[in-house]
Amino acid sequence: MGAAENNLEMEGTLEIGMEYRTVSGVAGPLVILEKVKGPKYQEIVNIRLGDGTTRRGQVLEVDGEKAVVQVFEGTSGIDNKYTTVQFTGEVLKTPVSLDMLGRIFNGSGKPIDNGPPILPEAYLDISGSSINPSERTYPEEMIQTGISTIDVMNSIARGQKIPLFSAAGLPHNEIAAQICRQAGLVKRLEKSDNLLEHQEDDNFAIVFAAMGVNMETAQFFKRDFEENGSMERVTLFLNLANDPTIERIITPRIALTTAEYLAYECGKHVLVILTDMSSYADALREVSAAREEVPGRRGYPGYMYTDLATIYERAGRIEGRKGSITQIPILTMPNDDITHPTPDLTGYITEGQIYIDRQLHNRQIYPPINVLPSLSRLMKSAIGEGMTRRDHSDVSNQLYANYAIGKDVQAMKAVVGEEALSSEDLLYLEFLDKFERKFVAQGAYDTRNIFQSLDLAWTLLRIFPRELLHRIPAKTLDQFYSRDTTN
């Protein structure tokens, strides 16, 4: 029993229950037990193999004296003759502490950076605490990423959940690392209209969870965080591609439980980045298939919408608590298909999306963010006078309109030729080219604060005469149209 007790690092002190040697079958990551007295849903079990090694599992299904257990470390080597199972009577909990900042953990929450063990300040259920909906506070105030297309046109509010829709071969990992390097709190302005500080204060933290990534990607994130000095405010959870698939189901929940502790108990504003949610959905499908459930679209379980919501809805702010949790899940769309169940259901739950475009990437534009299908539904509450600048919303609307018209003119040019275009059409083509080369494109280590991005946007809008800027009020044009961009 000592070996099993040593394997309970995540649960703390538990009352070990009875041992059973009643394994009746193994199906994929699942173990079926019979003649079990009083098993409980989501109860943690300790599994000891014939060679003395121990593993952990969780009860997925209960039917009388029959229990189905998912094994986090995989079912290889489990037999029905020598394997014993202990029921702990506890749900899965993870140790949390402020000391987790600057540390690297595996997908189960165990340190893998050769550092000292974490001295937990609490053990929390990885499913999270239930939040009274009436106590939620509307997300306000902007998180500055330093990326112009996000900050100006898809501003992220503190407490928002907004995914990155990407695909295989696109630089979503580089964009995620850049956001981690550059993201910070934006100070609410009093009456100043020209001074905004990118704050690197102690109140901001990042929880990064990688699911199903290869070793190269894991090393990229570890090296990037350590080299640029942002590691001290990052907690990193890594579930590698060769780790058990079933572990991917608990990795985002452990990460979010850590984020909830940092936000609601330590008062920090936490940015949670989850990559890759497509790997999480595939793990969910694997468990569903092993349980022989009726499949939904493309083999994914019918409850995947509900399951994803239990992750995404843990973002937000709570009345009376200083901290907040902002989520940026990253998912890769198979075959660039935005109608795939994972991005489709994610889009229903989250508050917008940021779309990474393959055509822009093929033209060597980084970050290849296509602003037209991108959207931030809570942007209006995070910008404007007192938050960023009074012209922010109008500039964003005008950029969207002119870029959309420019794309239409570009398509028309391919049909009728440049000679058939009007002088006004040529202005939109000029704007289209400069917008993508100067505004969308920026270096991976190029940080632009919100004022630099807005002034750059005005430089592009000055391509047009005032009378063509229909979405900007005359009062705003009077103040900004002819202003020197050097402030």
Curated annotation (Swiss-Prot):
Its main location: membrane. Keywords: Acetylation, Hydrogen ion transport, Ion transport, Membrane, Transport, Vacuole. SUPFAM superfamilies: P-loop containing nucleoside triphosphate hydrolases (SSF52540). It is a peripheral membrane protein. The modification N-acetylglycine is found at G2. InterPro entries: ATP-synt_VA_C, ATPase_a/bsu_AS, ATPase_F1/V1/A1_a/bsu_N, ATPase_F1/V1/A1_a/bsu_nucl-bd, ATPase_V1-cplx_bsu, P-loop_NTPase, V-ATPase_su_B/beta. One of its GO terms (molecular function) is proton-transporting ATPase activity, rotational mechanism. Pfam families: ATP-synt_ab, ATP-synt_ab_N, ATP-synt_VA_C. One of its GO terms (biological process) is ATP metabolic process. PROSITE patterns: ATPASE_ALPHA_BETA. GO terms for cellular component: proton-transporting V-type ATPase, V1 domain; vacuolar membrane. It is found in: Vacuole membrane. V-ATPase is a heteromultimeric enzyme composed of a peripheral catalytic V1 complex (components A to H) attached to an integral membrane V0 proton pore complex (components: a, c, c'', d and e). Belongs to the ATPase alpha/beta chains family. Non-catalytic subunit of the peripheral V1 complex of vacuolar ATPase. V-ATPase is responsible for acidifying a variety of intracellular compartments in eukaryotic cells. NCBIfam families: PRK04196.1, V-ATPase_V1_B. HAMAP family: ATP_synth_B_arch (MF_00310). This is V-type proton ATPase subunit B2. It comes from Arabidopsis thaliana.
